[in-house]
Amino acid sequence: MGFLPFVFPFAELEVGQQLYWQIGNFRIHGQVFMTSWLLIGALLALVVIGTKKMERDPRGVQNLLEFLWDYIRDLARTQIGEKVYRDWMPFIGTLFLFIFVSNWGGALVPWKLIKLPSGELGAPTADINTTVALALLVSLSYFYAGLSNKGLRYFEYYVHPTPIMLPFKIVEDFTKPLSLSFRLFGNILADELVVAVLVFLVPLVLPVPVMFLGLFTSAIQALIFATLAAYYIGEAVEEHH
């Protein structure tokens, strides 16, 4: 291929390189921890700014926080039910905000300008370990919700409306976290890779509309994840199970 007058720099696009930290017997992904804590810190700073001086007529950041509070409250109430939705608002809100900020942080922050010994920074939700951990938290949460509200009666769900459903309900418990984690991971990673390829090919114009589309899909993915988490919890506490 030496006759080609140019070479596309696709070899510079690498997926899977990691910066590892060794903590005792555990080896963790350092770049995921760094970006996660930076984004969590930015989110906490936003909350502090918005609640530092509360006003009856909310403006600016306070207005944004109150809008988010109302939105998460309505989402939890709709999916979980009037009886226990307040207990689960902090969990659903934390999931939504962390995923939303992580997705948008990956799309808006030029992480690749920060050089690391190995690997590169990016959205925490573009790492399968993060999305699997979030999905497992959701699974543990709806098990806890069902058992805490119904006790051992919760397991009647697995044979409702007929015992034939038992193997299907067990398989469903495995497919729920799989679908949650891989949907979020796949969408965010694909968005980052598409933008990276387009930046190499047409660095000035073409990536911009794709980035805006990525922001939209990132917000949708955060909403889908939080809505499904609330739905699974609501399903576990429903009395007819």
UniProtKB/Swiss-Prot annotation:
Keywords: ATP synthesis, CF(0), Hydrogen ion transport, Ion transport, Membrane, Thylakoid, Transmembrane, Transmembrane helix, Transport. The keyword Protein transport does not apply. GO terms for molecular function: proton-transporting ATP synthase activity, rotational mechanism. One of its GO terms (cellular component) is proton-transporting ATP synthase complex. Its main location: membrane. Pfam families: ATP-synt_A (PF00119). The chain crosses the membrane at residues 30-50, 91-111, 128-148, 193-213, 214-234. InterPro entries: ATP_syn_F0_a_bact/chloroplast, ATP_synth_F0_asu, ATP_synth_F0_asu_AS, F0_ATP_A_sf. It is a multi-pass membrane protein. It is found in: Cellular thylakoid membrane. F-type ATPases have 2 components, CF(1) - the catalytic core - and CF(0) - the membrane proton channel. CF(1) has five subunits: alpha(3), beta(3), gamma(1), delta(1), epsilon(1). CF(0) has four main subunits: a, b, b' and c. Belongs to the ATPase A chain family. NCBIfam families: ATP_synt_6_or_A. Key component of the proton channel; it plays a direct role in the translocation of protons across the membrane. This is ATP synthase subunit a. It comes from Prochlorococcus marinus (strain NATL2A). The lineage of its organism: Bacteria, Bacillati, Cyanobacteriota, Cyanophyceae, Synechococcales.
